[in-house]
Amino acid sequence: DTIRPADMLGRWHGGEFVTGHAMNGLLTKIGWYGKNFISTSEVQPLVCRNDAGELYSNTEVGKGEASLWAVEFRGEVTASMVYDGQPVIDHFKRVDDTTVMGIMNGSGGLIGGRHFYFYLERDS
């Protein structure tokens, strides 16, 4: 199902679907935890763990932060995260009340003609 941007607010932890995409494994290498949707205009797209286990927003790898919008993708309007510093949009679809599936899109997210797929689970 589609999801509204306001329903994405809060912190989420995530993982990737291993599909053979060139990005598979890269998020693990940087200690990716998930995403933090503070407001529709303030999103931390790459929340990672440092060596001490503390969470931080990795703006270096993410090339800044992001914002949330309602964007049409594959014929449906759904919550989508637009990166501030790179041509990437993550589109989200609701799986259940605490889980969404994400698909990375845009000229910076489409690698070899393939999308990167991931999931997010809402922190309690």
Regions found by a protein language model. Give the residues of each.
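Soluble ligand-binding/transfer domains with enclosed cavities or grooves
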Residues: 1-124
